[in-house]
Regions:
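Residue-level recognition of well-ordered beta-strand positions that form the cores
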Residues: 6-8, 65-67, 153-155
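Long, charge-dense
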Residues: 77-124
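N-terminal ordered "arm"
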Residues: 2-47
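Extracellular/virion structural assembly segments
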Residues: 2-13, 25, 71, 75, ...
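N-terminal interaction modules that seed assembly of large macromolecular complexes
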Residues: 31-71
Length: 194
C-alpha cells in the first residue's frame, strides 16, 4: 500500500463518537461497495491508527485511514463526496504517500463472536423451524461472555437489520496481498502502521 488518506472524527457535543462512527463507516462502506470487482473484492483497505487493545475492552479511537496501492484508486473512491453530509463532524485529508519509515503492518479483520444468547436463539429458531422461546431455552445455561473487541454498529440496507461489525487488529511484521472486503477489512491483507 503506497497511498492513504485520513479521516478524523471531530469531537462534538451534538453527536457522540459511537454514533458518528456508525454514520461515517456506513458511508465509507457504500463507497467501497461501488468499487467491488466481480468477485466482490475491493482494492482499498482501512486501518484505525488509534486502535487500543485492552484486557476488558478496546477502542477504535477517532481516526480512520484508507489505503490503496495506486493514488488513482483513492481518487476514484472520492471519500469527501461520500462524507459530504457529515462535513461538520469529520475532517478528511487529501491523498498522501505512505511514509517510508513504518512501525510495521496490521491486519484489520471482521470478528463474529458467538456470545449473545438471543442472537444464537434467533439463528437456531430460523434454521430449525421452531419458535424463538423454545430456541432460547437451549441457551439458557450459557454464561455471559464479555468481548473486548471494539465494534461499529451498522444498519444493513438490504435487510434493514442493525448489527455490530466487530473489528479485530492483528499486528504482523511483513506485508501481504492487497484485496479487501466491502468494509475495507481482510483476514489476510495488511495495511501499513505508522
Amino acid at each position: 500500500m503506497k497511498y492513504y488518506l485520513e479521516i478524523t472524527l471531530l469531537p462534538n457535543p451534538v453527536i457522540n463518537l459511537l454514533t458518528l462512527w456508525s454514520k461515517v463507516f456506513q458511508q465509507i462502506h457504500l463507497g467501497l461497495v461501488e468499487m467491488q470487482d466481480n468477485q466482490k473484492r475491493v482494492p482499498i483497505g482501512v486501518s484505525f491508527p488509534e486502535y487500543i487493545i485492552g484486557e476488558k475492552y478496546s477502542v477504535l479511537g477517532g481516526k480512520l485511514r484508507l489505503f490503496a496501492q495506486e493514488e488513482t484508486t483513492l481518487a476514484r473512491l472520492d471519500a469527501p463526496k461520500w462524507l459530504s453530509r457529515l462535513s461538520d463532524y469529520v475532517h478528511c485529508t487529501g491523498i498522501r504517500s505512505v511514509p517510508e519509515k513504518l512501525n510495521g503492518y496490521a491486519i484489520f479483520q471482521r470478528e463474529q463472536p458467538k456470545i449473545s444468547k438471543e442472537r444464537l436463539a434467533r439463528r437456531y429458531a430460523s434454521r430449525h423451524g421452531i419458535d424463538y422461546d423454545s430456541a432460547l431455552l437451549r441457551y439458557s445455561e450459557m454464561a455471559h461472555k464479555l468481548i473486548p473487541t471494539p465494534f461499529i454498529r451498522l444498519k444493513s440496507l438490504s435487510s434493514d437489520n442493525t448489527f455490530c461489525l466487530w473489528i479485530r487488529k492483528i499486528a504482523v511484521t511483513e506485508p501481504s496481498s492487497n484485496t479487501f472486503s466491502s468494509y475495507g477489512l481482510s483476514a489476510t491483507s495488511t495495511v501499513p502502521e505508522f
